[in-house]
Amino acid sequence: METVESSSSAELLRAQMHFSTQLFGFHYTAALKCAVKLGIPDAIKQHGKPMNLSELNSALSINPSKAPCIHRLMRILVTAGYFAQENECFSLTSAGRHFLKDDPLNIRALVLLELHPALVKPWIALGEWFQNDDVSPFATAHGKSFWDYVTSDPELRKLFDESMADDSQLIAKALVTEFRYVFEGLKSLVDVGGGSGTLARAIAKAFPNLKCTVCDLPDAVANEHGDGNLDFVAGDMFERVPSADSILLKHILHDWSDEKCVEILKKCREAIPKNGGKVIIVDKLLKNRGHGHAENEHDEATESPLSCDMEMLVLVNGKERDEKEWAKLFSGAGFNDYKYNITPVLGSTSLIEVNFYN
């Protein structure tokens, strides 16, 4: 077995660089959050052309004594790929445009949510959680569940809702353009846990003959109003799902344990008519893999869903799943005569279409 003593200097250097990249990775996301809060992407866009540091400092609401530090912030953000620098001037990259306020597909809220102190603190409590009886690291850090905390904090609730809506915008664009076949021929669809209805609205608009219903908890739909073929109803997915020939679950099941997911899927199965229908699931998909993997297997397609899996553990003690785990849930929920298709939609997010007969 190779030891530290027998490793070459080059190997030790590679190991140290890998460690440093992992350890200090959050510096990049923290810098990105800072840029979003300061409005740097919008300032550059409004300027209409690349900005030099003097112009950028003048456009931002910062303490004049901190102006000399902006170039250091921009330097790390250029390295991260959100901005480009040429001849001492900065411009937005295609990645950086996702943080513009007026971009319909912006993910500003997600950045602010992920770096919110309430969501960062549970990661620090992860080790403590492994040694206690709390339901989640979030509960260890805050003394209450994630859902109870969000409900009690209006600012965080607003940020969470905006983040979910932004995510739905991205998913909706893909579904109604590249995956229209999933909805063709359907008469009714219930978006379970659909919140403000961002995804359901897009589907209802793209398919005017499809009756769409958003079913969520009373406080989530209290201020929402339907229109045309879109409606909102208050309900609890653990008690009853409104009847329809298709049920949509976007980023719902990864919040829950296998046992709770089976309960939800059973309610979905009960909501679908005797002649059959489909459950449409939009969620992360883990790669099927063995107990080990190659030392150099560090690709984004693998790392992104694994990071999301850890986030589900930390926040709500939920989980992401691989194909075998999804199939186990379907069988556990009583989907006896069924078939399913899994198709990548956006990054590590997949569309799982479960067709079955009751």
Curated annotation (Swiss-Prot):
Give its E.C. classification number. 2.1.1.-
How does its activity hinge on pH?
Answer: Optimum pH is 7 with (S)-reticuline as substrate.
Please list the residues that make up the active site.
254
Q: Which GO terms describe its biological process?
A: isoquinoline alkaloid biosynthetic process; methylation
Write down the top EC class of this protein.
Answer: transferase
Annotated binding of S-adenosyl-L-methionine, by residue: 193, 216, 236-237, 250
Name of the protein described by the UniProt record = 3-O-methylredipecamine 2-O-methyltransferase IpeOMT3
The organism is: Carapichea ipecacuanha (Ipecac)
